[in-house]
Amino acid sequence: MIAYPNSANISLFLLRVKTDADDLGNQVLRLVGSKEVVGVTSSITSKEFYQSKETKVLLDFKVSIQAFLYDKSKYVYVPNEDTIYIVERSYQNGMWMELYCSETQLKKEEIEGWNL
C-alpha cells in the first residue's frame, strides 16, 4: 500500500456542546450538533510540546481538516479510540484548519443528547 502525503487518515466528529443546568441546577453538557469529517493527523512538534508543558496544557495530537468544514467546535470525538478530546487551539493554515487536541476525561454518557 502506498501512502500519499496529506491523505486523510482519521475519521472524527466535531462536537458542538453547550453547558446548561438541569432541573436541580446541576451543570450538564448537552450535545447541540455534530459533524463527521476526515482529517490528517500528525504529531505535535517538539517546540509545540515544550510550549504546551510551559502553559500546563498537554497536547496529544494535531489534526488538519479542510478549513471550510470547521464550525468552531470545541470538542472532537474519535470513534476508533472511543475518546473525546478538547480543541485547545485552532490555527488556519491556508485551506487547512489545524486543531490541537488534548484528551479529556469526558465520557459519552455524561453528554445529554448523545446520538453518535
Q: Residues of each region from the PLM?
A:
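Short, conserved turn/kink motifs that form compact alpha/beta structural patches or helix kinks used as
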Residues: 27-116
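Active-site-proximal polar cores
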Residues: 1-28
